[in-house]
């Protein structure tokens, strides 16, 4: 796969992905074959892991996912070979993550979502009963990304990445926006609105599923994803506003607004919970 272009008397093919030096190739034109091999390239290590979410030093024992962010697009199909979770003794936690064939990358191939096996999180499910939870409260773990994890150009990372975190008790409580606290701006200014959550939230979802009714601006997270910072593009007026929260918003354990992640999977569901929006009013003076 790639694109073609005419450069004078030459026909130039630009491959979508870099051709490894050890792969034999051939060009076919006018019924003739022209074998060739890509020239060996100097391996330049410039790509690194830039961030891991959640960024807090402590996570719940029923943590649902990690987000790994890289500084450049990455080659797919390496995650389960190059990423591992170690316990406090330095031993690999076997099958901690849900090792699916289709890795969960964003469109730029720079952010990878690692899901913990839900079967080891939900109570009353066979994997948890037989194997146990991947994370144990009170223990420390290390997330390791091998240096040999290749970027889209085939180059390894600048260095191995390690992130140590401690595990606290499981979180089975739903997200409750009505319990959040507001640090309000002054009318006539563009001071940021700060909203302190009652717990850290899913970083990717929080920046997409929270907004201010009728307002535009920039939204970011602070304090290890436990605080929302909204800076408006226009001055605040002296009136009531509404913080809009999509009920698909999740905390670190996958609990949603008004709905815990750990529902009873064996009881028949008689009430359907529709996705909606919770509006939390606040007044600027």
Task: Describe each model-derived feature in a short phrase.
Residues 1-285:
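Acidic, low-complexity Ser/Thr/Gly/Pro-rich repeat segments typical of extracellular/periplasmic
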């Amino acid at each position: 796969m790639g694109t073609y272009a005419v450069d004078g008397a030459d026909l130039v093919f630009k491959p979508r992905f870099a051709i490894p030096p050890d792969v034999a190739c051939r060009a076919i034109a006018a019924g003739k074959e022209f074998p060739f091999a890509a020239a060996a390239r100097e391996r330049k290590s410039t790509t690194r892991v830039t961030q891991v979410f959640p960024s807090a030093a402590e996570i719940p024992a029923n943590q649902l996912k990690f987000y790994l962010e890289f500084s450049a697009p990455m080659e797919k199909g390496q995650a389960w070979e190059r990423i591992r979770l170690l316990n406090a003794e330095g031993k690999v936690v076997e099958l901690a993550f849900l090792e699916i064939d289709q890795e969960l990358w964003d469109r730029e191939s720079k952010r990878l979502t690692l899901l913990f096996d839900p079967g080891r999180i939900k109570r009353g499910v066979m994997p948890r009963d037989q194997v146990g939870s991947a994370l144990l409260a009170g223990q420390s773990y290390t997330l390791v990304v091998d240096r040999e994890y290749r970027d889209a150009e085939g180059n390894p990372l600048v260095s191995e990445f390690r992130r140590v975190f401690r595990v606290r008790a499981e979180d089975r409580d739903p997200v409750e926006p009505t319990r959040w606290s507001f640090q309000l701006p002054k009318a006539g200014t563009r001071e940021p609105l700060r909203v302190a959550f009652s717990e850290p939230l899913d970083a990717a979802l929080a920046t997409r599923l929270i907004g201010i009714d009728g307002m535009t601006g920039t939204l970011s997270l602070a304090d290890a994803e436990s605080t929302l910072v909204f800076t408006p593009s226009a001055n605040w007026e002296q009136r009531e506003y509404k913080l809009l929260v999509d009920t698909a918003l999740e905390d670190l354990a996958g609990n949603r607004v008004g709905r815990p992640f750990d529902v009873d999977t064996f009881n028949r569901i008689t009430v359907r919970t529709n996705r909606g929006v919770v509006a939390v009013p606040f007044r600027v003076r």
